[in-house]
Amino acid sequence: MSLIPSFFGGRRSNVFDPFSLDVWDPFKDFPFNNSALSASFPRENSAFVSTRVDWKETPEAHVFKADLPGMKKEEVKVEIEDDRVLQISGERSVEKEDKNDQWHRLERSSGKFMRRFRLPENAKMDQVKAAMENGVLTVTVPKEEVKKPEVKTIDISG
């Protein structure tokens, strides 16, 4: 193990190719690298597996927003299960390789993703809507109106 960084080394480095120079990682050769984590989540899927989703509640609805850059609506599936579970899933395919192509970087994520959310009792399951614009999926789940308790005035006798 060398303590001197190899700025021009690495799997995809070429001294004469300005796009292939890897950023030096001082912990790369240490025994505590994330090899166990890397084995369970391959690098090409790691970012996609953890698709970010925001969930906010307004007075009228529960609103979910998922960042899905570069995906088309045909590649995404939104489902509601009987037990009030909202499921957002999809798959981004790996770009087809041409034997004449030379890759300098391969950093964009690919693979499948799935996120599940248990919806509260007040969710109107039959009125869920989804829209996708500029790589952001928005799922709107309307809420049932909360009934105000009836107040009955009682006459006081005596």
UniProtKB/Swiss-Prot annotation:
Pfam families: HSP20. One of its GO terms (cellular component) is cytoplasm. Residues 44-158 form the sHSP domain. Keywords: Cytoplasm, Stress response. CDD domains: ACD_ScHsp26_like (cd06472). It is found in: Cytoplasm. Forms oligomeric structures. PANTHER family: HEAT-SHOCK PROTEIN 20 FAMILY MEMBER. Belongs to the small heat shock protein (HSP20) family. This is 18.2 kDa class I heat shock protein.
